[in-house]
């Protein structure tokens, strides 16, 4: 692949977790909130679809209803405002929660390191990348192709994400009873 054919989106789960904590969203609703945010870039969702999932429910094109997180209007609006932020400076000025600030600092450190060794213009911050799985704890990465391919029916399709992953501090403890931090990625094409 040429450098202009892919984008590496990076974020930090601590940023959104700090926002969730600041909004005092109960633990039993947090997974639904994360999964709603994770759907922002999925076909048929956008901000309206996320808003529906943050509130009462979302009805898709087939008529199927997905129960939402049942957040207050204010909580949902603050999350939607967060999703519109595009740069670290604005994010740093907006989110004051210590956990969010820690995640922002860690992202700044990533970009500082990248700046020393390369000119990776294809690495971008994308705060909506949260990965819907609860075991991610901080750094998150998602790599997307920037071009379409022709499928076996002759139709141009967007492949989207081909490599995703991140850091997880407590995943192994589910199986071994000991906290061992790790980082992992997976490759795949639908």
Predicted ranges, named:
Residues 20-21, 33, 41-45, 58-65, ...:
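Short alpha-helical interface elements
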Residues 17, 34, 169:
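Glycine-centered loop/turn positions within well-structured domains
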């Amino acid at each position: 692949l040429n450098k202009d054919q892919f984008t590496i989106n990076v974020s930090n789960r601590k940023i959104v977790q700090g926002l969730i904590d600041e909004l005092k969203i109960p633990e039993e609703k947090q997974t639904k909130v994360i999964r709603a945010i994770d759907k922002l870039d999925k076909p048929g969702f956008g901000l309206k679809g996320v808003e529906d999932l943050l509130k009462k429910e979302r009805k898709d094109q087939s008529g199927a209803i997905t129960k939402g997180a049942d957040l207050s209007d204010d909580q949902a609006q603050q999350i939607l405002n967060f999703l519109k932020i595009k740069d670290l400076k604005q994010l740093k000025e907006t989110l004051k929660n210590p956990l969010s600030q820690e995640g922002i600092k860690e992202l700044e450190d990533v970009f500082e390191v990248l700046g020393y060794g390369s000119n990776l213009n294809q690495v971008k911050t994308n705060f909506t990348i949260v990965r819907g799985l609860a075991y991610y704890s901080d750094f998150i990465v998602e790599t997307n192709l920037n071009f379409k391919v022709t499928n076996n029916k002759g139709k141009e399709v967007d492949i989207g994400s081909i490599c995703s992953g991140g850091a997880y501090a407590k995943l192994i403890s589910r199986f071994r009873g000991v906290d061992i931090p790790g980082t992992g990625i997976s490759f795949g094409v639908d």
